[in-house]
């Protein structure tokens, strides 16, 4: 009985949070004005075929990234896991920057560099001050084009990825949705 009451209480809290969000908007007009103030996304294509999506929110921070249509869905028995592996290896250094130099440069900008792999894509991105977008783009380009794949880093990341795979395999929800 106590568990059932606890479950109802949790559901009620979730519902009430939703009601509070709706109350913030006093009318449909307010919702419409809010939606109209979302910056438009402009998509352009470079001569090399690369598509660039951009929004100018006027904010002092920005997120820039590279979304690559290469996730686990594109893999087969021979190259299974390669997108995830390359995502892990990307931040181990480049021809121009060691791993430490890369970390310090990003940290000194006050930026955040990250990546993830899904079934559909592999993503590399940086969150930074708007004024630092050109530098963040240069760093991302260096990582994508010039990553070093050292033997010791490969061995270390291999064990990290194998451990992550074990965690995913033990999570029923991850297995079902994969």
Task: Pin down the residues of each PLM region.
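His/Glu-rich zincin catalytic helix
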Residues: 2-101, 125-128, 138
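Acidic/histidine-enriched segments that form metal/cofactor-coordinating
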Residues: 17-25, 29, 94-95, 99-178
């Amino acid at each position: 009985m106590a568990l059932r009451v606890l479950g109802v209480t949790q559901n009620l809290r979730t519902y009430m949070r939703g009601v509070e969000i709706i109350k913030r908007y006093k009318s449909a007009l307010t919702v419409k004005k809010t939606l109209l103030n979302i910056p438009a996304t402009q998509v352009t294509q470079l001569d090399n075929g690369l598509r660039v999506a951009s929004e100018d929110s006027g904010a002092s921070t920005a997120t820039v990234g590279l979304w690559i249509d290469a996730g686990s869905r594109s893999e087969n028995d021979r190259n299974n896991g390669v997108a995830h592996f390359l995502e892990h290896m990307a931040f181990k250094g480049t021809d121009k920057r060691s791993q430490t130099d890369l970390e310090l440069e990003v940290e000194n900008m006050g930026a955040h560099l990250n990546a993830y792999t899904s079934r559909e894509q592999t993503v590399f991105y940086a969150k930074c001050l708007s004024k630092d977008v050109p530098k963040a783009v240069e760093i991302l380009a260096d990582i994508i084009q010039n990553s070093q794949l050292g033997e010791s880093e490969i061995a270390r990341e291999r064990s990290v990825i194998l451990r992550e795979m074990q965690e995913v395999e033990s999570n029923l929800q991850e297995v079902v949705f994969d």
